[in-house]
Structure formats: structure tokens, C-alpha cells
């Protein structure tokens, strides 16, 4: 018959056997690998996207401390005096974007407005394309097409305009044999961008409202 101490040992033995063995410092589980930061992946994806028009304006605004005087020429080639618009002409600019763009004075005022929004390159590109389409000499066409590409299409240019990938691919193919219409699709896209994005703000701008008031005052004085 077991003595009381032996009986106590027999009762406690099974309970100790059911308990899991303790881990020593050598048997400790390896630390969990660090979690990847999901923001890194998102950041990479964002960087692969092209800047939209708002980001371009903000980027240029942060790098330009002041505006330089606007040259009197339209494409900075041959200086010409800026025409003075009539009151009727100024009012017609609000009727349609086409009327604004077909007016030399309208283009000049609108270009000045685009400069304040840091998107003047859109107008410069459109004007350069208009000059290219009027050129008949193939050697001149080749040179002008190259300059337009370097100034407004190349991703290395500070004056790069916002074009989608389809239009860019088309330009790259056409640049193998440039013609006067190499940039037609791109010109239409930039024209549409100015029409939808910048034109409504121009009509509400202080500059255009001042021209309207000036024209109204002029009409009243003549009456």
C-alpha cells in the first residue's frame, strides 16, 4: 500500500504529463516576417500614371515665381502688334470657342489667360500645328515637325502637352515620314481640352469681364 507522499506523487503525475512542454530559448518560434507596406505598391502604381492637366498646372506653378512678359507674336517667330478687339468682337467670344480661336485678338487674350493657369503650351502647340499645316516645303515640314515633337510631345520637354497613349503612338509612327498633318489628331485633342477645361473659366475670369466692361463703356461714350 503506498504511503501518503507516494499517493500524492501518483495523483499529480498524470496532470503534469498532460501539460505541453515548455519552450527553451533555443526552441522559440522564429519571428513573423515584417508586413509589406501596401502604400509602397500604390505609390508605384500612381507614379506610372501620367499627370493630368490639374497636376501639370500645379507643378508649373510651384516652379515659376513670376510670369515673364508675353511676346507680341503668336508663336514667337515674327513679332506682330497685338490687335485691339472691338466691343462686338469681345462679346462674340462668349458665343462659341470657335469664334474666340478664329479671332487674332481673342487668341492673344486667351493665351495670356492660359499663362496665368500655367497651360500656355496648349495654345502654343495648337498654333504651331496651324503653321505646320500651312507649309508646303517638305524640308521645312520635316524641321518644323521635329521641333514640335521635341517641344510639345516629348516627355522630356517642360512644355509637354497632355496626350493619350493612342495619339502618342500615332505620332511616333508618323514621325518616320513627317507630313503637314502629322499632329492633326493631337491638335484636335488639345483643342477639345482647351474648349472644355479652360474656355469656361476664361469667360468667368476678371480679364474677360474687364474687356466686356471696357467695351460697354466705349459703346456708351460713342452713343
Curated annotation (Swiss-Prot):
A UniProt-annotated Pfam family: RGS
Swiss-Prot/TrEMBL GO biological process terms: autophagy; negative regulation of signal transduction
Gene Ontology terms: cellular component: membrane
Gene3D superfamilies: 1.10.196.10, Regulator of G-protein Signalling 4, domain 2 (1.10.167.10)
Post-translational modification note: Fatty acylated. Heavily palmitoylated in the cysteine string motif.
Complex and partners: Interacts with GIPC PDZ domain. Interacts with GNAO1.
Protein name: Regulator of G-protein signaling 19
Native organism: Bos taurus (Bovine)
